[in-house]
Amino acid sequence: WIMGHMVNAIAQIDEFVNLGANSIETDVSFDKNANPEYTYHGIPCDCGRTCTKSEKFNVFLQGLQKATTPGDSKYQVKLVLVVFDLKSSSLYDNQASDAGKKLAKSLLQNYWKNGNNGGRAYIVLSIPNLTHYKLITGFKETPKTEGHPELMEKVGYDFSGNDDIDQVAKAYKKAGVTGHVWQSDGITNCLPRGLDRVKQAVANRDSSNGFINKVYYWTVGKRSTTRGALDAGVDGIMTNYPDVIADVLSESAYKSKFRIATYEDNPWETFKN
Protein backbone atom coordinates (compact mmCIF):
# COMPACT_ATOMS: atom_id res chain seq x y z
CA TRP A 1 0.00 0.00 0.00
CA ILE A 2 1.46 3.36 -1.07
CA MET A 3 -0.18 5.70 1.41
CA GLY A 4 -0.47 9.38 0.47
CA HIS A 5 0.19 11.44 3.59
CA MET A 6 -1.92 14.35 4.87
CA VAL A 7 -4.60 14.38 2.16
CA ASN A 8 -6.95 16.93 3.73
CA ALA A 9 -8.53 18.71 0.75
CA ILE A 10 -10.78 16.96 -1.78
CA ALA A 11 -8.60 18.17 -4.68
CA GLN A 12 -5.61 16.34 -3.15
CA ILE A 13 -7.31 12.94 -3.53
CA ASP A 14 -6.80 12.96 -7.31
CA GLU A 15 -3.38 14.56 -6.96
CA PHE A 16 -2.02 11.76 -4.74
CA VAL A 17 -3.72 8.88 -6.55
CA ASN A 18 -2.43 10.18 -9.88
CA LEU A 19 1.10 10.11 -8.43
CA GLY A 20 0.71 6.42 -7.57
CA ALA A 21 -1.01 6.24 -4.16
CA ASN A 22 -3.57 3.44 -3.69
CA SER A 23 -4.28 4.65 -0.17
CA ILE A 24 -4.54 8.03 1.55
CA GLU A 25 -4.20 9.30 5.09
CA THR A 26 -6.51 12.08 6.23
CA ASP A 27 -6.32 14.03 9.50
CA VAL A 28 -9.51 14.43 11.52
CA SER A 29 -9.82 17.17 14.15
CA PHE A 30 -12.58 17.18 16.79
CA ASP A 31 -14.50 20.01 18.42
CA LYS A 32 -14.82 20.22 22.20
CA ASN A 33 -17.98 18.08 22.13
CA ALA A 34 -16.14 15.22 20.41
CA ASN A 35 -17.72 15.84 16.98
CA PRO A 36 -15.39 15.24 14.04
CA GLU A 37 -15.04 18.75 12.64
CA TYR A 38 -12.36 19.29 9.97
CA THR A 39 -9.86 17.34 7.90
CA TYR A 40 -7.01 19.40 9.22
CA HIS A 41 -3.45 18.87 10.44
CA GLY A 42 -2.19 22.32 11.38
CA ILE A 43 1.28 23.64 12.15
CA PRO A 44 3.83 22.09 12.53
CA CYS A 45 3.64 19.30 9.97
CA ASP A 46 6.08 17.64 7.57
CA CYS A 47 9.00 19.46 6.00
CA GLY A 48 8.14 20.61 2.49
CA ARG A 49 4.36 20.48 2.97
CA THR A 50 1.57 23.03 3.53
CA CYS A 51 0.05 22.17 6.92
CA THR A 52 -3.20 24.11 6.72
CA LYS A 53 -5.33 22.61 3.91
CA SER A 54 -8.72 21.55 5.20
CA GLU A 55 -12.38 20.77 4.54
CA LYS A 56 -15.33 20.28 6.83
CA PHE A 57 -15.16 16.58 7.72
CA ASN A 58 -18.57 15.68 6.29
CA VAL A 59 -17.82 17.55 3.05
CA PHE A 60 -14.53 15.66 2.70
CA LEU A 61 -16.36 12.37 3.25
CA GLN A 62 -18.77 13.20 0.45
CA GLY A 63 -15.83 13.87 -1.90
CA LEU A 64 -14.13 10.67 -0.75
CA GLN A 65 -17.32 8.70 -1.31
CA LYS A 66 -17.44 9.87 -4.94
CA ALA A 67 -13.77 8.94 -5.44
CA THR A 68 -14.40 5.39 -4.16
CA THR A 69 -17.80 4.56 -5.71
CA PRO A 70 -17.68 2.65 -9.03
CA GLY A 71 -19.63 4.46 -11.72
CA ASP A 72 -19.16 7.93 -10.22
CA SER A 73 -17.54 10.51 -12.52
CA LYS A 74 -14.86 11.12 -9.84
CA TYR A 75 -14.18 7.39 -9.27
CA GLN A 76 -10.54 6.38 -8.75
CA VAL A 77 -10.31 2.60 -9.12
CA LYS A 78 -6.87 2.44 -7.47
CA LEU A 79 -7.92 4.10 -4.19
CA VAL A 80 -8.73 1.17 -1.90
CA LEU A 81 -7.74 2.18 1.65
CA VAL A 82 -8.17 5.32 3.77
CA VAL A 83 -6.46 5.93 7.10
CA PHE A 84 -8.19 8.47 9.32
CA ASP A 85 -5.52 9.96 11.57
CA LEU A 86 -7.75 10.91 14.48
CA LYS A 87 -6.43 13.97 16.29
CA SER A 88 -8.15 12.82 19.48
CA SER A 89 -5.41 14.09 21.83
CA SER A 90 -7.51 17.26 22.14
CA LEU A 91 -10.24 15.23 23.90
CA TYR A 92 -10.55 14.00 27.48
CA ASP A 93 -10.26 10.22 27.88
CA ASN A 94 -13.94 10.05 28.90
CA GLN A 95 -14.97 11.56 25.53
CA ALA A 96 -13.35 8.79 23.48
CA SER A 97 -16.46 6.61 23.25
CA ASP A 98 -18.59 9.59 22.14
CA ALA A 99 -15.99 10.55 19.54
CA GLY A 100 -16.15 7.00 18.16
CA LYS A 101 -19.95 7.03 17.97
CA LYS A 102 -20.06 10.44 16.30
CA LEU A 103 -17.33 9.50 13.84
CA ALA A 104 -19.21 6.33 12.88
CA LYS A 105 -22.46 8.26 12.46
CA SER A 106 -20.75 10.74 10.19
CA LEU A 107 -19.25 7.95 8.05
CA LEU A 108 -22.56 6.11 7.96
CA GLN A 109 -24.40 9.14 6.59
CA ASN A 110 -21.77 10.80 4.40
CA TYR A 111 -19.53 7.96 3.24
CA TRP A 112 -21.49 4.71 3.42
CA LYS A 113 -24.79 6.46 2.53
CA ASN A 114 -26.56 4.33 5.16
CA GLY A 115 -25.49 1.14 3.39
CA ASN A 116 -26.92 2.24 0.04
CA ASN A 117 -24.10 2.14 -2.57
CA GLY A 118 -21.65 4.26 -0.57
CA GLY A 119 -17.87 4.33 -0.93
CA ARG A 120 -16.07 0.99 -1.10
CA ALA A 121 -12.66 1.79 0.43
CA TYR A 122 -11.40 -0.01 3.50
CA ILE A 123 -11.04 2.32 6.48
CA VAL A 124 -8.37 2.32 9.21
CA LEU A 125 -9.08 4.29 12.39
CA SER A 126 -5.69 5.50 13.61
CA ILE A 127 -5.71 6.56 17.27
CA PRO A 128 -2.80 8.37 18.95
CA ASN A 129 -3.51 7.45 22.59
CA LEU A 130 -3.86 3.93 23.99
CA THR A 131 -6.11 5.42 26.70
CA HIS A 132 -8.65 6.24 23.95
CA TYR A 133 -9.40 2.56 23.20
CA LYS A 134 -13.10 3.29 23.88
CA LEU A 135 -13.15 5.25 20.62
CA ILE A 136 -13.13 1.81 18.99
CA THR A 137 -15.91 0.37 21.16
CA GLY A 138 -18.06 3.47 20.61
CA PHE A 139 -17.46 3.30 16.85
CA LYS A 140 -18.31 -0.42 16.66
CA GLU A 141 -21.67 0.04 18.42
CA THR A 142 -23.03 2.53 15.90
CA PRO A 143 -23.33 0.47 12.67
CA LYS A 144 -24.91 -2.30 14.78
CA THR A 145 -27.56 -0.05 16.33
CA GLU A 146 -28.20 1.56 12.92
CA GLY A 147 -28.79 -1.85 11.32
CA HIS A 148 -25.58 -2.10 9.27
CA PRO A 149 -23.19 -4.37 11.22
CA GLU A 150 -21.74 -5.61 7.90
CA LEU A 151 -19.97 -2.26 7.44
CA MET A 152 -17.56 -3.17 10.25
CA GLU A 153 -16.01 -5.69 7.84
CA LYS A 154 -14.53 -2.63 6.11
CA VAL A 155 -12.98 -1.12 9.29
CA GLY A 156 -9.57 -1.71 10.86
CA TYR A 157 -7.50 -0.13 13.62
CA ASP A 158 -4.11 1.38 14.38
CA PHE A 159 -2.56 2.91 17.49
CA SER A 160 -0.13 5.49 16.15
CA GLY A 161 1.79 6.60 19.26
CA ASN A 162 4.85 4.34 18.75
CA ASP A 163 3.97 2.67 22.05
CA ASP A 164 5.49 -0.55 23.33
CA ILE A 165 3.97 -3.40 21.26
CA ASP A 166 2.88 -5.27 24.43
CA GLN A 167 0.98 -2.21 25.65
CA VAL A 168 -0.74 -1.91 22.26
CA ALA A 169 -1.86 -5.54 22.57
CA LYS A 170 -3.40 -4.76 25.99
CA ALA A 171 -5.35 -1.79 24.61
CA TYR A 172 -6.83 -3.98 21.86
CA LYS A 173 -7.82 -6.55 24.44
CA LYS A 174 -9.73 -3.87 26.37
CA ALA A 175 -11.41 -2.74 23.14
CA GLY A 176 -12.40 -6.32 22.26
CA VAL A 177 -10.46 -6.19 18.99
CA THR A 178 -9.26 -9.41 17.39
CA GLY A 179 -8.10 -8.85 13.82
CA HIS A 180 -8.17 -5.94 11.35
CA VAL A 181 -5.03 -4.55 13.04
CA TRP A 182 -2.57 -2.30 11.23
CA GLN A 183 0.49 -1.18 13.17
CA SER A 184 2.16 2.08 12.31
CA ASP A 185 5.64 3.17 13.21
CA GLY A 186 7.31 6.40 12.33
CA ILE A 187 8.05 10.05 12.72
CA THR A 188 7.80 13.29 10.75
CA ASN A 189 10.02 13.33 7.67
CA CYS A 190 12.02 16.20 9.26
CA LEU A 191 13.66 13.74 11.69
CA PRO A 192 15.48 10.44 11.28
CA ARG A 193 14.15 7.25 12.89
CA GLY A 194 15.59 3.74 12.94
CA LEU A 195 13.74 0.57 11.98
CA ASP A 196 14.01 -1.29 15.32
CA ARG A 197 10.34 -1.00 16.26
CA VAL A 198 9.19 -1.70 12.69
CA LYS A 199 11.16 -4.94 12.85
CA GLN A 200 9.49 -5.80 16.19
CA ALA A 201 6.06 -5.16 14.64
CA VAL A 202 6.91 -7.32 11.60
CA ALA A 203 8.13 -10.09 13.95
CA ASN A 204 4.79 -9.92 15.79
CA ARG A 205 2.90 -10.06 12.48
CA ASP A 206 4.92 -13.08 11.34
CA SER A 207 4.72 -15.01 14.61
CA SER A 208 2.09 -17.70 15.20
CA ASN A 209 0.53 -15.80 18.12
CA GLY A 210 0.88 -12.19 16.94
CA PHE A 211 -2.02 -9.71 16.88
CA ILE A 212 -0.78 -7.49 14.03
CA ASN A 213 -2.01 -8.09 10.46
CA LYS A 214 -0.18 -5.30 8.61
CA VAL A 215 2.73 -2.96 9.35
CA TYR A 216 3.29 0.48 7.83
CA TYR A 217 6.08 3.02 8.18
CA TRP A 218 5.76 6.83 7.97
CA THR A 219 6.63 9.40 6.63
CA VAL A 220 9.05 8.31 3.93
CA GLY A 221 10.34 10.49 1.10
CA LYS A 222 13.79 9.11 0.27
CA ARG A 223 14.61 6.14 -1.91
CA SER A 224 17.12 4.81 0.63
CA THR A 225 14.55 4.90 3.47
CA THR A 226 12.00 3.21 1.20
CA ARG A 227 14.42 0.38 0.48
CA GLY A 228 15.16 -0.03 4.20
CA ALA A 229 11.45 -0.28 5.02
CA LEU A 230 10.82 -2.79 2.21
CA ASP A 231 13.82 -4.86 3.33
CA ALA A 232 12.32 -4.91 6.84
CA GLY A 233 9.15 -6.42 5.33
CA VAL A 234 6.53 -3.70 5.75
CA ASP A 235 3.10 -3.89 4.08
CA GLY A 236 2.64 -0.15 3.62
CA ILE A 237 4.68 3.03 3.30
CA MET A 238 3.21 6.46 4.02
CA THR A 239 4.72 9.23 1.95
CA ASN A 240 4.44 12.77 0.64
CA TYR A 241 5.85 11.48 -2.67
CA PRO A 242 3.95 8.40 -3.90
CA ASP A 243 5.91 8.46 -7.17
CA VAL A 244 9.18 7.89 -5.27
CA ILE A 245 7.81 4.76 -3.58
CA ALA A 246 6.36 3.51 -6.89
CA ASP A 247 9.78 4.03 -8.53
CA VAL A 248 11.57 1.96 -5.88
CA LEU A 249 8.95 -0.80 -6.14
CA SER A 250 9.74 -1.07 -9.84
CA GLU A 251 13.46 -1.73 -9.15
CA SER A 252 14.57 -5.28 -9.95
CA ALA A 253 15.30 -6.07 -6.27
CA TYR A 254 11.67 -5.38 -5.32
CA LYS A 255 9.42 -5.93 -8.29
CA SER A 256 9.39 -9.72 -7.90
CA LYS A 257 8.72 -9.50 -4.14
CA PHE A 258 6.14 -6.70 -3.91
CA ARG A 259 3.21 -5.45 -5.92
CA ILE A 260 0.77 -2.59 -5.43
CA ALA A 261 -2.36 -3.73 -3.60
CA THR A 262 -5.73 -3.67 -5.36
CA TYR A 263 -9.29 -3.84 -4.06
CA GLU A 264 -9.12 -7.65 -4.26
CA ASP A 265 -6.34 -7.71 -1.63
CA ASN A 266 -7.81 -8.05 1.84
CA PRO A 267 -6.06 -5.52 4.11
CA TRP A 268 -6.94 -7.58 7.21
CA GLU A 269 -5.21 -10.71 5.97
CA THR A 270 -1.70 -11.38 7.22
CA PHE A 271 0.84 -11.90 4.47
CA LYS A 272 3.97 -13.28 6.12
CA ASN A 273 7.49 -12.75 4.86
Curated annotation (Swiss-Prot):
Its main location: secreted. Its EC number is 4.6.1.-. SUPFAM superfamilies: PLC-like phosphodiesterases. It catalyses: an N-(acyl)-sphingosylphosphocholine = an N-(acyl)-sphingosyl-1,3-cyclic phosphate + choline; an N-(acyl)-sphingosylphosphoethanolamine = an N-(acyl)-sphingosyl-1,3-cyclic phosphate + ethanolamine; a 1-acyl-sn-glycero-3-phosphocholine = a 1-acyl-sn-glycero-2,3-cyclic phosphate + choline; a 1-acyl-sn-glycero-3-phosphoethanolamine = a 1-acyl-sn-glycero-2,3-cyclic phosphate + ethanolamine. Mg(2+) binds at residues 25, 27, 85. GO terms for molecular function: lyase activity; metal ion binding; phosphoric diester hydrolase activity; toxin activity. One of its GO terms (cellular component) is extracellular region. Expressed by the venom gland. Disulfide bonds join 45-51, 47-190. It is found in: Secreted. It comes from the Eukaryota. CDD domains: GDPD_like_SMaseD_PLD. Binds 1 Mg(2+) ion per subunit. The active site is at residues 5, 41. Dermonecrotic toxins cleave the phosphodiester linkage between the phosphate and headgroup of certain phospholipids (sphingolipid and lysolipid substrates), forming an alcohol (often choline) and a cyclic phosphate. This toxin acts on sphingomyelin (SM). It may also act on ceramide phosphoethanolamine (CPE), lysophosphatidylcholine (LPC) and lysophosphatidylethanolamine (LPE), but not on lysophosphatidylserine (LPS), and lysophosphatidylglycerol (LPG). It acts by transphosphatidylation, releasing exclusively cyclic phosphate products as second products. Belongs to the arthropod phospholipase D family. Class II subfamily. This is Dermonecrotic toxin LdSicTox-alphaIB3avi. It comes from Loxosceles deserta (Desert recluse spider).
